[in-house]
Amino acid sequence: FTGQITAAGKVPPAKVMVIGAGVAGLAAIGAANSLGAIVRAFDTRPEVKEQVQSMGAEFLELDFKEEAGSGDGYAKVMSEAFIKAEMALFAAQAKEVDIIVTTALIPGKPAPKLITREMVDSMQPGSVIVDLAAQNGGNCEYTVPNQVTTTANGVKVIGYTDLPGRLPTQSSQLYGTNLVNALTLMTRARDGHLVSEFDDEGVRTRTTVRDGEITFPPPPSEVSAAPAPAAKEVAPVEPPPPPKERPW
């Protein structure tokens, strides 16, 4: 990932593009940045720009304005014009980067196809695409679930769907931590009795039935959105000073 300068010459750092800045995308950004790569990332939600930049990556933006957030932290299906603009961006980036990590998912729908065969064919030999959306069909047209595909021009497309199982120790630790935290929220008295307090969003989103009443699905979670640009105050225009009187 990192570049090197040796007596034999200079090797530039790897260029990485991450599509989708959710939990998985931000983790990929952080990992690539810590290894010394030049990282750039894209997400349809403008409110994640600061998160991407805080992880050390460049946030790729489109010269196109459209509301992309669904109000619950997930992306929504975009218009054809927006998709056309982002596909043009991905096509340009594919020619430059060495690694592409895709994490784009839309709840309840197949993964959107964001990396076309033409984009992959334009990449340099030895480039790698890691499709973390392979289980839902994949973001890349070359992706085959549970397989590593090597294209004719030497690009590897990784479509594993069992990545947590490939890291069993770390996955078990993280899963166990989540369970402990969830049970702590629901047993605040530490007496073993579950209490569903709907004022806690973590408890509310996990509860499906309470007191015999179906409470699922929960209301959408409001997430922080990109702040609207503040209206600039227009200074009052002062009249020009009167002309000076001349002695002639």
Q: Model regions: which residues?
A:
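Glycine-rich phosphate/diphosphate-binding loop of Rossmann-like nucleotide-binding domains
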Residues: F1-Q93
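Adenosine-phosphate binding glycine-rich loop
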Residues: Q4, P13, A134, C140-E222
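Short, solvent-exposed amphipathic alpha-helical segments in soluble enzyme
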Residues: N33-L35, M55-A57, T116-S122, V144-V148, ...
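Charged, alpha-helix-enriched surfaces in structured cytosolic catalytic cores
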Residues: E47, A85, A92, Q124, ...
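Short acidic/glycine-rich loop or secondary-structure boundary segments that cap or lie
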Residues: K49-E50, G69-S70, K109-A111, G137-E141, ...
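ADP-ribose/adenylate-binding Rossmann-like module
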Residues: I99-I158
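Cytosolic-side membrane-insertion boundary helix
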Residues: A228-W248
